[in-house]
Amino acid sequence: MTYKYNCCDDGSGTTVGSVVRFDNVTLLIDPGWNPSKVSYEQCIKYWEKVIPEIDVIILSQPTIECLGAHSLLYYNFTSHFISRIQVYATLPVINLGRVSTIDSYASAGVIGPYDTNKLDLEDIEISFDHIVPLKYSQLVDLRSRYDGLTLLAYNAGVCPGGSIWCISTYSEKLVYAKRWNHTRDNILNAASILDATGKPLSTLMRPSAIITTLDRFGSSQPFKKRSKIFKDTLKKGLSSDGSVIIPVDMSGKFLDLFTQVHELLFESTKINAHTQVPVLILSYARGRTLTYAKSMLEWLSPSLLKTWENRNNTSPFEIGSRIKIIAPNELSKYPGSKICFVSEVGALINEVIIKVGNSEKTTLILTKPSFECASSLDKILEIVEQDERNWKTFPEDGKSFLCDNYISIDTIKEEPLSKEETEAFKVQLKEKKRDRNKKILLVKRESKKLANGNAIIDDTNGERAMRNQDILVENVNGVPPIDHIMGGDEDDDEEEENDNLLNLLKDNSEKSAAKKNTEVPVDIIIQPSAASKHKMFPFNPAKIKKDDYGTVVDFTMFLPDDSDNVNQNSRKRPLKDGAKTTSPVNEEDNKNEEEDGYNMSDPISKRSKHRASRYSGFSGTGEAENFDNLDYLKIDKTLSKRTISTVNVQLKCSVVILNLQSLVDQRSASIIWPSLKSRKIVLSAPKQIQNEEITAKLIKKNIEVVNMPLNKIVEFSTTIKTLDISIDSNLDNLLKWQRISDSYTVATVVGRLVKESLPQVNNHQKTASRSKLVLKPLHGSSRSHKTGALSIGDVRLAQLKKLLTEKNYIAEFKGEGTLVINEKVAVRKINDAETIIDGTPSELFDTVKKLVTDMLAKI
């Protein structure tokens, strides 16, 4: 059997996706995109040759490295996704992937009110709504459609929801592990490669190949030691009104570092230290990462939750009024000590460095040895590495280096477009959306026709979509038309955009009252070729809104109605854009917001504050501010022109380099991978980034290591050592089964092997000619070849002792596991295949021998 593997390169010089081709199915794994290296147009040009061949996409991590191109691909190749391509990922990867995509695209100007706009915020949301959410160890069974294909996701231990994928067919088993961590950190358990006893997981043993990369590794120091160094660095940086800047991936390491900062502040308040230090978050996605984290606690380490439950039942992601969601130009509003988490994208990092990088009171903590999406941080790393004296202690000890140099940084200047340019851009955008929606609607109808077996059905929803096509397109700044068209037959009632669409139609009903259509109940037309499930009258159940965790409940109906003092919008569920607060909060809430989040002497005040922050998500300022509102990224009345220029900036800040990555270290990787006993290890391209030392160790252990080239298909062949044979039902009725233990039965099988062709699936699906082996009964004239009897089973001396005791014999163990019966007969196990019964011929000897043979099955 063969399979083909290809490392995709869109021009960045690195692997931005992996394509695995089996006989009748092609998988794309982790399609990434780095806007700082490859432009939007170049990326589309590359993927337009790849996507038409793809059937399934799987995502392993919520970082840009693994899903940066997903929304881009869905938007530009929607017809392929609607008609064929299924995307699978765990729920945290879906949620946090939205955050990383918004940050990356907004930094590059792909979304937002700019003249470089290519997508809307709604397009990103819709692309992630298409992904099928999974749990760990949940089987994705595609065997009937793709000839034995199954997918299983296991915990990778790097990011929340990060996965190691096991891809299996009838003849192959591939393990894909791009990033993984064998030890637990502050919020996540270790990867599921090893079980509780330290042995490799049986379901991952002996794969055809392990697909991984050896370019990044974590520190060999224990996590607790690195965490202590990190907290000590924070304390030192906050002293003397200092500021700490932490660039971090908001969908990756941010939650781990945030909980460590929370622990530091919690412990410091007990000794009245750092009681008023704000925690600032600078991200285009604002506070969505924390909001998602609060709804995904079951994906985190139970020990973390237990620890914080014991701390007066607080949450690791609730700091109260300390947390502020700000923009870079608002940093000047927070003088003195502060902790700043900055999203690891070039535009934000550069603005922050320009604002605070020239202050000696600023400490910049770099938590990993390279930053692909922020070139300015790589330049700072190069400055530190140039000093050989400092390099000797780099990077584990967390030593502070004074950086007094000039570096060149790209800055983005935004200039408002004129009214004429804005209107022309909106008209162009309107035409583009109208054409795209018409194409999508046609693809949707064709896909539905194929799925229904060409049955003609009175599709009320489809006709309504056609009638209101122009209405939807004209409301470009309102409800996105794609929300209605893409609703389809699956989970229409679960999307809240449908309610917005109904409101939109109601608003237009007065204008088009004369054209209003009345729905008349009619029978459906059933064609002979229609599937059996469509030969029935339609049934429209009541609409019940659901999300990933069950039925959506409006909690406002359980709260007291006090419209004068209560902000109604603050009780809405999080992550609903446009839910702006209109009425001011009462004076008591404002007072609670201004107080410190860790008032140890007043638990009642803390509980009320915790409740307020949980429902409102306010930043603690005088005016109510939505924690997750991203309306500023929508194209409204004004548009800006982005101009990129380079400036020289003087740095006078302190730099601390500390490897806090949740990745496996080099020594552990060289030990764990060989324990899986894989036939080969396939390393993603390019070859020069792979660790040569570990590669040599793997080769020394007789493991075939394959370094993949970029954009070149490599074919791998696998010798089949096992065969799947089905037993014919007629032969099954003739078998005499014998039980040899509580879990196993055996039988003697004699028959003739016949090759049969498998039935074909639907004609519009891709299939491969495959046959199966069936064992059928011999003809009546045939005689089986007789050989000596073979005994199969396991002789358990403990069970034998129990049987003899029930027969009133005296059986006891004596020396080296020998079972002695009545001091006359002894039973010893030499090994698993040899058992000796020692004694003189007697009735007792025969009884013991019979009990032993009864434990075995003879064939």
Swiss-Prot record:
Report the GO molecular function annotations: RNA binding
Region annotation Disordered: where it falls in the sequence:
560-611
Keyword Hydrolase assigned to the entry: answer is no
Q: Does the keyword Lyase apply?
A: no
Question: Mostly located where?
Answer: nucleus
Q: Where is the composition biased (Acidic residues)?
A: 586-597
What Gene Ontology terms describe where this protein resides (cellular component)? mRNA cleavage and polyadenylation specificity factor complex; nucleus
Q: Name one GO biological process term.
A: mRNA processing
Localization recorded for this chain is:
Nucleus
Q: Which UniProt keywords apply?
A: mRNA processing, Nucleus
What is known about what this protein does?
A: RNA-binding component of the cleavage and polyadenylation factor (CPF) complex, which plays a key role in polyadenylation-dependent pre-mRNA 3'-end formation and cooperates with cleavage factors including the CFIA complex and NAB4/CFIB. May be involved in poly(A)-site recognition. May be involved in the association of the CPF, CPFIA and RNA polymerase II complexes.
| Misc. comment | Present with 3060 molecules/cell in log phase SD medium.
Quaternary structure and partners: Component of the cleavage and polyadenylation factor (CPF) complex, which is composed of at least PTI1, SYC1, SSU72, GLC7, MPE1, REF2, PFS2, PTA1, YSH1/BRR5, SWD2, CFT2/YDH1, YTH1, CFT1/YHH1, FIP1 and PAP1. Interacts with the CTD domain of RPB1/RNA polymerase II; the interaction is enhanced upon phosphorylation of the RPB1 CTD domain. Interacts with PCF11.
Protein name, UniProt field:
Cleavage factor two protein 2
The organism encoding this protein is Saccharomyces cerevisiae (strain ATCC 204508 / S288c)
Q: What is the lineage of its organism?
A: Eukaryota, Fungi, Dikarya, Ascomycota, Saccharomycotina
